[in-house]
Amino acid sequence: MRLPDLRPWTSLLLVDAALLWLLQGPLGTLLPQGLPGLWLEGTLRLGGLWGLLKLRGLLGFVGTLLLPLCLATPLTVSLRALVAGASRAPPARVASAPWSWLLVGYGAAGLSWSLWAVLSPPGAQEKEQDQVNNKVLMWRLLKLSRPDLPLLVAAFFFLVLAVLGETLIPHYSGRVIDILGGDFDPHAFASAIFFMCLFSFGSSLSAGCRGGCFTYTMSRINLRIREQLFSSLLRQDLGFFQETKTGELNSRLSSDTTLMSNWLPLNANVLLRSLVKVVGLYGFMLSISPRLTLLSLLHMPFTIAAEKVYNTRHQEVLREIQDAVARAGQVVREAVGGLQTVRSFGAEEHEVCRYKEALEQCRQLYWRRDLERALYLLVRRVLHLGVQMLMLSCGLQQMQDGELTQGSLLSFMIYQESVGSYVQTLVYIYGDMLSNVGAAEKVFSYMDRQPNLPSPGTLAPTTLQGVVKFQDVSFAYPNRPDRPVLKGLTFTLRPGEVTALVGPNGSGKSTVAALLQNLYQPTGGQVLLDEKPISQYEHCYLHSQVVSVGQEPVLFSGSVRNNIAYGLQSCEDDKVMAAAQAAHADDFIQEMEHGIYTDVGEKGSQLAAGQKQRLAIARALVRDPRVLILDEATSALDVQCEQALQDWNSRGDRTVLVIAHRLQTVQRAHQILVLQEGKLQKLAQL
């Protein structure tokens, strides 16, 4: 049997004993007397234990024990001062207290630590590890929002003004009550009403400006994240897009980026507003009555503990309800889907009983959920009413002693009603921020992903012959590395010649075209262009010299001109029309209402299939490439358009690779390559 690790507890006792010895000696004489000295002693003790245990790497075991251990005594003595009067509260020091007091302190702290551990939900250690990872994501989001810092500062400024106005309204409400309850002063009454209206209008205006700044910040962050993510996606290798579903990428670009952009402004708004509200409200409450202010904090630990217990049980019952509803749905699907079998065996009543039992389980779980909710609300309400009764009792005593007025007590009660929700927000906001930042993890993983591509090439010669050589080229797709598509291909494509690549479906013809465009990297061998590896050429230069027309051309929403000149930095209209004429696309373009500026619709939806094919060929010809790849593109062309393409080929010494099925295209080729199962089967010179 493995013994538990006692090092954290031994270290805690030794370090605490050393700190108490220091606080009992010369260091303790420097501390003030009374409650301030007691709180300062507890703070120094907490800081010392925290720092020394963290230095030794033992904080994670006993970290939650330190807070009740060090601050239980100051809190207890402070509460005694509130109930019995400050003059009779014992100004004790933990360092000079008897050992029995220390044992009681350790026992109470250990009991609270054990209770907290029992109430912790299962998987707390894994959750802590997730929060560590989320902290890294949180800091990355903050850095990503750095350009919007001026807007956030402006939003914080308006936030402070809005909160200040909201906080001052109850103050002047109390002034109005005091004026109406005493000797009526018209000038003082008018002044109080004026300031109430002024601060109401000012807080509303400031709140609107605050919301505008945060909303504008969200839109800027959203655009920045989407731009960076889209830029990163376009740089990825094609293997990434084969492994990742398009719907998932759309989800990251739309919903996840929106969640990321909303994270900082919304959480900063809630956090800063709650923080300023708590500071402002407690400032006013302390100015009215310090004793009532401390009493208002009495129910906070109990409320937080009750909420922790409720949330743990609530999450558990929600999971059980989800499972029970799924089981009930499964009964319905099985019965309806196999209705013929149910009737053939006369099992209708049996299925009804099964469904009734499943519904009964759901009903019991719903009842348990509602009962626990009611008990939780009852506990919160009883705690809240108990503290309010205690405060009203103390407030009445202070009014009788002349320390408070009716208006001051009313203002204090208004402040106390709203401050509790802001304190709870501050307690839970950090955990919520860490939990909600998880949407950024996948987005950042895409942005950080390095494409499986060689280093960018730099070759961009002024002249290019267009000699293409495949030297013992083999290839397998990244998602299927054990299934090679090409196996040791060796052939040459020469300028001025048309090479026909034929073979059955799945033989690797389109893969040859993809390798020639440097869309994939061979797993073996080399693809050479003018005796240089094709990966050494500069990206834009290569794709201006090696151009492909696919079997199913892809057009983009926009004008005819934009689609033909797609990817070119500058292209004159005359050059666009010349390419369209060479592809026999000028006839239908001239018949359009706006000519080359006519919108083709999404994916070219306004065009026929043959028209799309001609625009795709014009898009290739406008670049005047040295190497042209026709991936079964001629199959959608008529004879006249195909003849125009042959005329374009005959006007220069270009290298043309045609992936074809038509006999007419093969007969006009200078060279025929036959692929079958990734191997070159036949090489015929015509």
Curated annotation (Swiss-Prot):
Region of interest (Part of the peptide-binding site), ranges: 301-389, 414-433
Primary residence: endoplasmic reticulum
EC number(s) per entry: 7.4.2.14
Site (Inter-subunit salt bridge with TAPBP): 16
Class of the enzyme per the UniProt entry, highest EC level: translocase
Parts of the chain that traverse the membrane: 7-27, 57-77, 99-119, 149-169, 188-208, 267-287, 294-314, 375-395, 409-429
Source organism superkingdom: Eukaryota
GO MF annotations, alphabetized: ABC-type peptide antigen transporter activity; ABC-type peptide transporter activity; ATP binding; ATP hydrolysis activity; metal ion binding; MHC class Ib protein binding; peptide antigen binding; peptide transmembrane transporter activity
Lumenal side of membrane: 1-6, 78-98, 170-187, 288-293, 396-408
Cellular compartments per GO CC: endoplasmic reticulum; endoplasmic reticulum membrane; endoplasmic reticulum-Golgi intermediate compartment membrane; membrane; MHC class I peptide loading complex; nuclear speck; phagocytic vesicle membrane; TAP complex
ABC transmembrane type-1 domain sequence ranges: 152-435
All residue ranges annotated as the ABC transporter domain in the record: 468-686
Reaction(s) catalysed (UniProt annotation): a peptide antigen(in) + ATP + H2O = a peptide antigen(out) + ADP + phosphate + H(+)
Required co-factors: Mg(2+)
Membrane-topology annotation of the record: Multi-pass membrane protein
Positions of ATP binding: 503-510
Gene3D superfamilies: ABC transporter type 1, transmembrane domain, P-loop containing nucleotide triphosphate hydrolases
Disease involvement: MHC class I deficiency 2: An autosomal recessive, progressive disorder characterized by chronic bacterial infections of the upper and lower respiratory tract apparent in the first or second decades of life, nasal polyps, and ulcers with granulomatous inflammation affecting the nasal cavity, upper respiratory tract, or skin. Patients may develop bronchiectasis and respiratory failure.
PANTHER family to which the protein is assigned, alphabetical: ATP-DEPENDENT PERMEASE MDL1, MITOCHONDRIAL, TRANSPORTER 2, ATP BINDING CASSETTE SUBFAMILY B
Quaternary structure and interacting proteins, as annotated: Heterodimer of TAP1 and TAP2 (TAP1-TAP2). A component of the peptide loading complex (PLC), interacts via TAPBP with MHCI heterodimer; this interaction mediates peptide-MHCI assembly. Recruits TAPBP in a 1:1 stoichiometry. Interacts with classical MHCI such as HLA-A*02-B2M; this interaction is obligatory for the loading of peptide epitopes. Interacts with non-classical MHCI molecules including HLA-E-B2M and HLA-F-B2M as well as PLC component CALR before the peptide loading.
Name of protein: Antigen peptide transporter 2
Organism from which the protein derives: Homo sapiens
Gene: TAP2
